[in-house]
A protein has these predicted regions:
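Interface amphipathic segments
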Residues: 1-266
Length: 266
């Protein structure tokens, strides 16, 4: 089957072509959808295509974005495969990132030693081993701590030196933003509580060609006794602390939690 919409206009937004096709035979179903703005579009010229296949034992989806010059800004997908053998061979869903050399924000990446998978067990425990980097140290890392047999989840996430200029260039109608974005997060969940720590930084942030500067934010969420939860957060600008916030979440007898937050602006 096929479907398409041409010359769609909503206020000032104009999309030249939106299409969707589906083909099916006895072995698989193929899906293809996308948006195309031609070179005569008054706003942005680009093409975005989603290509998918649903097969007997797995399914696959790939995103392909090209700018008006035909340069590939995004080429990234995922293969999903159910595992139900049990006995150490898996009992959940296995996700594999594709292709071997994906492209994000016009940058080509590679996976270190086939570290490109995420596995979700039927009990919702997430196991991950993703190491995706380019030749200049820009990249992503998601690792689960497999040695932790007590926690329900124990995951580390790192994003290193992502160019916001390149990222905003693959997002049509997105404001012009520049800077280098990095972040680290650690998440631990047990049967009774959770712990989360996040720190993110943008070096030389600009918005629509106006300099904002170096920005760093951080937050920590920690469990306490008797169901209490504690929050600590901060905001720095050009290496100067401009805000500190402390809070706590207190359970009550009525079942409605009480949140108290104290913030200090410098």
């Amino acid at each position: 089957g096929k479907a398409a919409v041409h010359a769609l206009k909503v206020d000032t937004l104009q999309l030249d072509t939106i299409f969707f096709t589906v083909k099916q035979d006895t072995t698989l179903m193929k899906l293809r959808a996308g948006v195309i703005n031609g070179p005569k579009n008054p706003q942005f010229s680009f093409s975005t295509t989603l290509t998918g296949e649903i097969r007997d034992r797995d399914a696959e989806l790939l995103v392909d974005f090209k700018n008006g010059k035909g340069e590939t800004g995004v080429l990234l997908g995922v293969n999903a495969r159910p595992l139900f053998e049990g006995k150490g061979k898996g009992d959940g869903l296995a996700f594999t990132l594709i292709p071997e050399e994906p492209i994000i924000a016009f940058q080509k990446f590679h996976f270190n030693e086939k570290h490109n998978w995420i596995y979700v067990h039927k009990n919702m425990r997430v196991y991950a081993n993703v190491d995706m980097w380019d030749d200049e140290g820009m990249g992503f890392r998601v690792h689960s701590v497999r040695g932790d047999t007590v926690s329900l989840q124990n995951i580390d996430v790192e994003i290193r030196r992502i160019s916001l200029a390149d990222l905003s260039s693959v997002l049509p109608y997105f404001p012009e933003i520049t800077g280098l974005f990095s972040a680290e997060a650690h998440y631990v969940q047990t049967e009774k509580d959770l712990q989360l720590s996040v720190e993110a930084a943008i070096d030389e942030l600009t918005y629509e060609r106006q300099r904002i500067g170096d920005v760093t934010v951080g937050a920590t969420w920690l469990p306490g006794e008797q169901g209490k939860q504690y929050l600590n957060a901060y905001l720095n600008h050009d290496e100067v602390e401009v805000m500190v916030a402390d809070g706590k979440l207190l359970p009550t007898r009525t079942g409605k939690d009480s949140l108290e937050v104290n913030a200090t602006l410098e």
